């Protein structure tokens, strides 16, 4: 599981930062990539990475402001042109489907795959399958804006082969049943409870991605105990009044959430073009005064999300 930042800027593209798009790479977990927001020129940023558009199976839009959205029609068309033929699901606020369908219709763009649209509820679970659970919550922005909590399901414990061998359980197809936790009867009449031969489950990871917002209660709930919190930081601590006026967050807002929610790592993105060089370092350092494990991300940064231990 990795996060790749395709764009980390705010408002409009800049030399140092493109507008927002984040790839959650789940290649080992389900051979997929999920995109969160698709700002203008996202597909140009993808050309600088190893990411394959056909691997993108889900797209999540935090809100419908242009710096999070204007790259979507072009990406969808290029995915089709480059051999993508598997269905793609887009999760977004009301109006997402109208925007996409209209853009494709007026440009006479024809896709080689089916699109499915899911309108985000104000709060609720939008995905719950064998490997992941995803919930969203409405935030506090000028228009409807959402945050997402992506929870990986726990990985089953490993089969303790050495223990089985020590207890004289011969290898064979029976091991598969034991790994499933079944009770099996051996040829010598012994009953083996599979649950006694499975190690502790590997606790799944949690990633929280927060769209444009002022500070609000929903953020802390979405971020609770997350391995990684990706939070917008449009402004620095000196611009708290401006941030609130424009329905955005500061680095200090984000750091306080990370501390309160007991997250493991805070990644700050959606950085205003006014912050360059030393100013970016100050954004990071000021946040670290509150929450030490903080990083201001840059375009094309790639972060691995490691496991953090097994369940007791």
Swiss-Prot record:
One of its GO terms (molecular function) is zinc ion binding. Zn(2+) 1 binds at residues 63, 65, 141, 212. It catalyses: Endonucleolytic cleavage of RNA, removing extra 3' nucleotides from tRNA precursor, generating 3' termini of tRNAs. A 3'-hydroxy group is left at the tRNA terminus and a 5'-phosphoryl group is left at the trailer molecule. Zn(2+) 2 binds at residues 67-68, 212, 270. Its EC number is 3.1.26.11. Homodimer. This is Ribonuclease Z. It comes from Latilactobacillus sakei subsp. sakei (strain 23K) (Lactobacillus sakei subsp. sakei). The lineage of its organism: Bacteria, Bacillati, Bacillota, Bacilli, Lactobacillales.
């Amino acid at each position: 599981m990795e996060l790749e930042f395709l764009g980390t800027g705010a408002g409009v593209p800049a030399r140092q930062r493109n507008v927002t798009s984040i790839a959650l790479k789940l290649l080992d977990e389900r051979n997929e990539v999920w995109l969160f927001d698709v700002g203008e020129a996202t597909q140009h940023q993808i050309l600088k990475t190893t990411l394959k558009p056909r691997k993108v199976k889900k797209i999540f839009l935090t809100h419908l402001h242009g710096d999070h959205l204007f790259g979507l029609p072009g990406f969808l068309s290029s995915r089709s042109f480059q051999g993508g033929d598997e269905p793609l699901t887009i999760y977004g606020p009301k109006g997402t489907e109208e925007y996409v369908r209209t853009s494709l219709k007026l440009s006479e763009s024809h896709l080689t795959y089916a699109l499915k649209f899911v309108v985000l509820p104000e709060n609720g679970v939008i995905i719950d399958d064998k490997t992941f659970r995803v919930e969203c919550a409405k935030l506090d922005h000028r228009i409807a804006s959402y945050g997402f909590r992506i929870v990986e399901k726990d990985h089953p414990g490993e089969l303790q082969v050495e223990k089985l061998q020590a207890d004289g359980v011969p290898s064979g197809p029976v091991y598969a049943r034991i790994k499933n936790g079944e009770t099996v009867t051996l040829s010598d009449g012994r009953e083996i409870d599979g649950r006694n031969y499975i190690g502790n489950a590997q606790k799944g990871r949690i990633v929280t991605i927060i769209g444009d917002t002022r500070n609000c209660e929903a953020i802390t709930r979405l971020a609770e105990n997350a391995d990684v919190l990706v939070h917008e930081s449009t402004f620095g601590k000196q611009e708290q009044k401006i941030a609130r006026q424009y329905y955005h967050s500061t680095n200090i807002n984000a750091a306080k959430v990370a501390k309160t929610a007991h997250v493991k790592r805070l990644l700050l993105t959606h950085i205003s073009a006014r912050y360059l060089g030393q100013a970016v370092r100050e954004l990071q350092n000021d946040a670290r005064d509150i929450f030490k494990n903080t990083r201001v991300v840059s375009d094309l940064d790639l972060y691995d999300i490691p496991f953090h231990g097994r369940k007791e």
